[in-house]
Regions:
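Alpha-helical solenoid repeat scaffolds of the TPR/TPR-like class and their adjacent stem/linker regions
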Residues: 1-408
Length: 408
């Protein structure tokens, strides 16, 4: 029981099996027995990162380096964690240090390329990925990372080839499949993209969100006419509302539909789909549930019903507002003056380094906000005060804000 290396090796095995909480316990025990065990601190950090406990991962990687300053692997994994935390300049320094310690370390060159990409330094990113592949041509991770950089540059055809090469080298490389799905979808190859999107559940981030039911996931083939199907939300509120466009199709196929969604959406979706039993998401009893025959995460709806959507068109106006609230807001907006009334939102409430390229600054809206005879309404949920003041001072335009408007 006091053999630190045995606990460490057990942790490695458990981590490989995806049993991350148990791996965590084994690494922790190894460290308790041997506090200066740098590799145990390092793999503890890697496991914490997979569990998205980033601050703790950072501490473990830092401790591994303190114990073993020439530990190149710890430096580059510290860099990965720093990048996840949005600390890109520090991440760059960590990857650079790893390469200084071990110049032929292909993985570190590839990780450096990822950080360059996030910084918008695409030429440097491509050079780093090229170097990684030159050092280790069979490194699937490097081909996948190269592909993702090309994707961000809009070079979809080239990106697809790099992802395919990564998958050829490692057919079960879930991250490459998942990244390929986004490129296929961006390139308009919907069927291929939706098929590859199913690999999301094998990636570390999504694997943590999967639900452990006794009953099976629908395979898209089994008839639903005598089945109760549980659909469950898996991502954000906007995603749930988007995927709800498929509910009328599923409802027409199944005996009964239970939809579990974010609590805030229950009134809206109950009103919009009266034939669906809408409930707030509750994962606490997953293993014991017996109120359905089959289940499906909502992100898989398009995969199974895309042919029908393409043939008949997308559902339109499928969300039904509360008529009393419609009347209330119509009167309130009319009191501001003439319309049209345009609600605007220019950034996510979940701004991260990875999401920054998808959003705009309020300054980029100047042409739109300068259009005459339009009344603009703020739909930004937080951190908007300075932006609205800037618009008022620089453009002389008031974007109206209602403090009592539920912005989600």
């Amino acid at each position: 029981p006091d053999f630190a290396q045995a606990h460490y090796n057990l942790g490695n095995t458990l981590k490989e099996l995806g049993r991350l909480d148990e791996a965590l316990a084994s690494y922790t025990q190894a460290i308790a027995l041997k506090p200066d065990y740098a590799k145990a601190h390092y793999n503890l950090g890697n496991t914490l990162k997979e569990l998205e406990r980033l601050d703790e991962a950072l501490a473990s990687h830092t401790q591994a380096i303190a114990l073993k300053p020439d530990f190149a692997e710890a430096h580059t994994n510290l860099g990965i964690t720093l990048q996840e935390l949005g600390r890109l300049d520090e991440a760059l320094a960590s990857h650079t240090q790893a390469i200084a310690l071990k110049p032929d370390y292909a993985e570190a060159h590839s990780n450096l390329g990822n950080t360059f990409k996030e910084l918008g330094r695409f030429d440097d990113a491509l050079a780093s990925h090229t170097q990684a592949i030159a050092l280790k041509p069979d490194l699937a991770q490097a081909h996948s990372n190269f592909g993702f950089t090309l994707h961000d540059l809009g070079k979809f055809e080239e990106a697809i080839q790099f992802f395919k090469k990564a998958i050829e080298l490692n057919p079960n490389f879930a991250t490459a499949h998942h990244n390929l799905s986004y490129t296929f979808l961006s390139y308009g190859m919907l069927k291929e993209g939706l098929n590859e999107y199913e690999w999301r559940w094998q990636t570390p981030k999504f694997n943590l969100q999967h639900r452990n039911f006794t009953y099976p996931m629908w395979d898209g083939k089994t008839t639903l006419k005598d089945k109760t199907v549980l659909l469950w939300c898996e991502q954000g509120i906007g995603d749930t509302m988007n995927w709800s466009s498929c509910l009328s199709i599923v409802t027409s196929r199944a005996k009964h539909i239970i939809l579990e969604c974010q609590k805030k959406l229950v009134p809206l979706l109950s009103r919009s789909f009266p034939n669906v039993e809408v409930k707030a998401e509750n994962r606490s009893l997953d293993a014991d549930r017996d109120d359905f025959d089959l289940h499906l995460p909502m992100g898989s709806l398009y995969k199974h019903f895309m042919d029908e959507i393409m043939e008949n068109g997308m559902a339109s106006s499928y969300l039904v507002p509360d008529p009393d609230r419609v009347k209330f807001w119509r009167e309130r907006l009319n009191s501001l003056g003439n319309g049209p009334y345009i609600g605007i939102s220019w950034k996510s409430s979940n701004m991260s380094v990875k999401r920054l390229p998808n959003y705009s600054s309020i300054s980029q809206w100047s042409e739109i906000l300068s259009i005459p005879d339009v009344t603009f309404i703020n739909l930004q949920s937080k951190d908007f005060e300075d932006d609205l003041s800037k618009v008022r001072e620089e453009l002389g335009v008031t974007v109206h804000n209602f403090d009592d408007l539920d912005q989600w």
